[in-house]
């Protein structure tokens, strides 16, 4: 929802959800920040996104920004180890997000469904959905 023109399917899906059912991981917040850091330093889009990440996203999610706890870190450790043993290493951020969703019994909403395949976490992509 940080795009100037969000995907209409995503916007419609978000609108249908009760706010209290939507959560975000601190890992996702870090990924958003990293993405902004990669933009040209003086660009107006970077300044706009920085403002949204620091002000609007915390407001939207308020007390629903989930930390990485010891239990989540331990879940990630198992997920990551299993994937490495299977010869399918995963991105650390994706693993932490999956572990957070598993710990809280949540569904990961992402465009990158394949990144979460085989992790035992429920995944949904509203991109292209109606």
Q: Positions of the model-derived regions?
A:
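Histidine- and aromatic-rich ligand-binding microenvironments
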Residues: 25, 90-91, 112, 130
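Acidic, PIN/NYN-like endoribonuclease modules and their adjacent C-terminal/linker elements
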Residues: 98-130
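Residue-level signal for short amphipathic helical patches enriched in basic/charged
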Residues: 5, 60, 111
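Short, well-structured N-terminal submotif of metal-dependent ribonuclease cores
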Residues: 1-28, 37-55, 71, 118, ...
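Active-site neighborhoods of divalent-metal-dependent phosphate/nucleic-acid chemistry enzymes
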Residues: 21, 34-40, 59-107
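Short, conserved clusters of charged catalytic residues that mark active-site
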Residues: 5-9, 92, 108
């Amino acid at each position: 929802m940080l795009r100037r023109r969000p995907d209409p399917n995503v916007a419609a899906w978000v609108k249908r959800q009760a706010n209290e059912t939507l959560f975000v991981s601190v890992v996702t917040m870090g990924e958003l920040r990293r993405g902004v850091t990669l933009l040209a330093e003086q660009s107006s889009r970077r300044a706009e996104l920085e403002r949204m990440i620091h002000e609007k996203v915390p407001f939207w999610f308020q007390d629903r920004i989930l930390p990485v706890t010891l239990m989540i870190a331990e879940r990630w450790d198992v997920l990551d180890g299993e994937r490495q043993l299977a010869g399918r290493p995963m991105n650390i951020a994706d693993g932490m997000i999956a572990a957070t969703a598993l710990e809280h019994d949540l569904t990961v909403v992402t465009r990158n469904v394949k990144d979460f395949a085989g992790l035992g976490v429920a995944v949904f992509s509203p991109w292209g959905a109606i």
